[in-house]
Amino acid sequence: MQTRNTFSWTWIREEITRSISVSLMIYIITWSSISNAYPIFAQQNYENPREATGRIVCANCHLANKPVDIEVPQAVLPDTVFEAVVKIPYDMQLKQVLANGKKGALNVGAVLILPEGFELAPPDRISPEMKEKIGNLSFQNYRPNKKNILVIGPVPGQKYSEITFPILAPDPATNKDVHFLKYPIYVGGNRGRGQIYPDGSKSNNTVYNATAGGIISKILRKEKGVYEITIADASNGRQVIDIIPRGLELLVSEGESIKLDQPLTSNPNVGGFGQGDAEIVLQDPLRVQGLLFFLGSVVLAQIFLVLKKKQFEKVQLSEMNF
């Protein structure tokens, strides 16, 4: 009987340990995937990355404003592949605070909003020269049914501060919803981690302010660099504890008097988000042919005019000699 009970408890402990280990592994893998793929935040929470005001939703999490640029051809022919180059400049020497509190290199990401009908070029349509510019980047559609909206990132900023998107222009002959017009292209690009998560909570890449005014009675440094700051409010005698995540530099000390919303930490953010736009013309080949024919006609007319003038001058000269 004693042997049976020992076996049962041993088996139960092993099963519990195994279940906890599996759950922990699933959590780590899932969290790592989410934290390393921040475009998924926008994809999960917004049907369209561009709001009615023109603001790209990535700005909701990346609060600092930084520049971004896009280069596209002035005009393209239907059913041709062209480059859309997104430039996300920043100082390569900068280091950001990572989720684990350590310092690391900045990543970059971008969202490209193309006109309806434009989409990512298939691999067999991309030239070797363009493939070399693209490198090992892997683009994805914002939604399966929104092939004109592309996202990329996070990718190493030191290698991909310029991102080349291979784009296939539509053909109005096969797509009746597309016309030979001038179209806008919108782009958003970020470097570094965001300051706010989609649920409204702060990351450790932003400033933390005091949630109450009073005297700092205690600063406790806990495991992994997390701080607990206890603020004693003299007006009502209550105590407030502010939690500061790891990786941040404190600006206050014990015994210091602080005000409501006073910064408790320095601002660690060295990145930011920017958005821009460009225009592209889907050119009708017949218009190009017509323009070439017109220019050729003008050149020929000029040549015949010069020849006629020389012939007239010769006739005049011969009459004068006669």
From Swiss-Prot:
PROSITE patterns in alphabetical order: CYTF
Transmembrane segments: 288-308
Domain of life according to the entry: Eukaryota
Annotated signal sequence range: 1-35
Binding site for heme: Y38, C58, C61, H62
Sorted UniProt keywords: Chloroplast, Electron transport, Heme, Iron, Membrane, Metal-binding, Photosynthesis, Plastid, Signal, Thylakoid, Transmembrane, Transmembrane helix, Transport
Assembly and oligomerization: The 4 large subunits of the cytochrome b6-f complex are cytochrome b6, subunit IV (17 kDa polypeptide, petD), cytochrome f and the Rieske protein, while the 4 small subunits are PetG, PetL, PetM and PetN. The complex functions as a dimer.
Protein name per the record: Cytochrome f
Native organism: Aethionema grandiflorum (Persian stone-cress)
Gene name tied to this protein: petA
